[in-house]
């Protein structure tokens, strides 16, 4: 179209008469050509700007796409690592479960063995209980027999004493007992707690010694020769009392200074509820479970 306009312009120039000025139509066409050129340049610039913007956005999109791909690759790697870790944990759990099953089976077998052992123990306890009861019966019979033998021995001892005195009937103490002022005394060579010593004397048809006077105290003190020995005095069941029922409050006393004190600082539990003769002679209260020597006493009796 531009070309046709130029051609038309040239034809008009040739047809114009010489010596005349260009017409107003020609000038208008020149101006139209300029506008068209400027429009084309503007349009080109606009297209260039659009292309630049699109190119810039495309570059940004490519960068964003690269970032997304990198993020996706990183996330994929992490997910793969997590899956591998989960697989490893699953294997460990399976091994742990297998081990637990083995342990449970072992414990089940041990429990069964324990039940069997418990039944055996119960059976053994029953057997031991029966044997213990039989032994107690035998021990009771044996104790009665020993006591009878002691009586027989005492009778023989007294009969021997009677023969030595030309048949005169005399009072006598059992063998290895010491006679003093109408009583027989037996001084132990071993040590026992107060309850065990009390039991021993009762089995001998006697009791732990009861000190009734200063004279008896001096006799015992001289015979003991500085040996600590239990006597038949206790307050385990209330106030102090003698084992043979002798009135303690009205009777002879020989406590050491500041005694009895019922001391709790010995660390053995409880107080001090049993009395003994000290090495110097005075009495002292002490823990009944301590072990000392002891003295048994019985009244002198005649045997026919």
Curated annotation (Swiss-Prot):
Q: Which UniProt keywords apply?
A: Calcium, Disulfide bond, Glycoprotein, Lectin, Membrane, Signal-anchor, Transmembrane, Transmembrane helix
Residues that carry a glycan: 74, 166
Presence of keyword Calcium: yes
SUPFAM superfamilies according to UniProt: C-type lectin-like
Q: Which residues lie on this side of the membrane: Extracellular?
A: 57-304
Enumerate the Pfam families for this protein.
Answer: Lectin_C, Lectin_N
Q: What is its biological role?
A: Recognizes terminal galactose and N-acetylgalactosamine units. May participate in the interaction between tumoricidal macrophages and tumor cells. Plays a role in the recruitment of inflammatory monocytes to adipose tissue in diet-induced obesity.
**The protein's name:** C-type lectin domain family 10 member A
């Amino acid at each position: 179209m531009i070309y046709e306009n130029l051609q038309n312009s040239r034809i008009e120039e040739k047809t114009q008469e010489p010596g005349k000025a260009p017409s107003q139509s020609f000038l208008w066409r020149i101006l139209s050509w300029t506008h068209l050129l400027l429009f084309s340049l503007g349009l080109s610039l606009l297209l260039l700007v659009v292309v630049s913007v699109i190119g810039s956005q495309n570059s940004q999109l490519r960068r964003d796409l690269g970032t997304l791909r990198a993020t996706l690759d990183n996330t994929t790697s992490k997910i793969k690592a997590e899956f591998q870790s989960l697989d490893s944990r699953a294997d460990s759990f399976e091994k742990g479960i297998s081990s637990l099953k083995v342990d449970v089976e072992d414990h089940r077998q041990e429990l069964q063995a324990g039940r069997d052992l418990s039944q055996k123990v119960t059976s053994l306890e029953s057997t031991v209980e029966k044997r213990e009861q039989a032994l107690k019966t035998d021990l009771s019979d044996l104790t009665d027999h020993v006591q009878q033998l002691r009586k027989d021995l005492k009778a023989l001892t007294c009969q021997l004493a009677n023969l030595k005195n030309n048949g005169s009937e005399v009072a006598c103490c059992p063998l290895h007992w010491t006679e003093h002022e109408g009583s027989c005394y037996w001084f132990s060579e071993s040590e026992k707690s107060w309850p065990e010593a009390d039991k021993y004397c009762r089995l001998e048809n006697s009791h732990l010694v009861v000190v009734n006077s200063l004279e008896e105290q001096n006799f015992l003190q001289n015979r003991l020769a500085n040996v600590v020995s239990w006597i038949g005095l206790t307050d385990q069941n209330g106030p102090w009392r003698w084992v043979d029922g002798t009135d303690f409050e009205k009777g002879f006393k020989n406590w050491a200074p500041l005694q009895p004190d019922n001391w709790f600082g010995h660390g053995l539990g409880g107080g001090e509820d049993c009395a003994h003769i000290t090495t110097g002679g005075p009495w002292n209260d002490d823990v009944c479970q301590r072990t000392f020597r002891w003295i048994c006493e019985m009244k002198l009796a005649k045997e026919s």
